[in-house]
Amino acid sequence: MKMIFEAPATVWQEAFPLGNGRIGALMFGDGEAETLCLNEDTLWSGYPGDPRTGMGYEDIKKAEVYAKEGSYLQATQVLNQAQETAEDVEMYEPFGTVRIWFEGEREIADYHRELDLETATARVTYRNHGQSYEHRCFCSAPSQVLVYQIRAEEAFTIVITADGGFLTGNSWDGKIWKMQGQMPGKSKIPVEAKEGDGSEFIFSENPQEKGMPYEGWCMFETENGEIVPTEMGVRCVNVHEITMRILIRSGFAGVSRHPYTQGNDPAKLLLQDQEQTGISVEELWKEHVGEYQKLSLIHISEPTRL
């Protein structure tokens, strides 16, 4: 079964979701640009500490008394007032957003995008000035890698950047584009925070108050052309095909371990992941599909049309 659309997705709510249980992505675009919103299941702000803020046992008991009396409004008010001082000291956070921009004037026609539910693969096809393009994306659990490809009948140039989340910088070592990030140490944003109330994330220079480090690596394979590093990312010039293999790791080492002083080194974990992605892209895809289809325990069918 496939989800098929004949129009681009312009916002993330219309994106195709992809993931492998640890790495997640939302893929959307319009033929002139593509966006990959990325996350990873261990990316949290904060660090181990006293989890009790705001609402306490006494507040709950007081609300219980009101509720038993049928005074539900008063019970709700008690809980809401207690929540006003509660802090979200540990919040699930995104990795960031990778953006792919096509250079030059584009004239898009015959746009088609689909999410194949039987292979967990997203595909986009269209024509630019009459020349065929195909985008493909999947997220492998066996190899722990997100693969994104563009193939075309003509040479094209794209600019790739990363922003959002808590990314702090990027670098190019001649082979790998590396994205680095640092989670906040604590969030001073109350549960009942209102927009513009001055609350903010806390970034401390004290190692004991630092948040979790994280990193993403992107390895490129191209047909023709060249890859040129830029201040914000990379530029792939006059290529006919490009494959991006994206790896993500955080410093998470357990819920009771400090993510900065006792955490893992993301770079070491990425080196281990890199060793698993040495096979060809088609082998990665077949491996991904084989593992994914082991979970095919149900069948979805369309209702009978009258």
Task: Please place each PLM-identified region on the residue numbering.
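Acidic/polar, glycine-enriched structural segments that form the non-catalytic walls/loops
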Residues: 1-301, 305
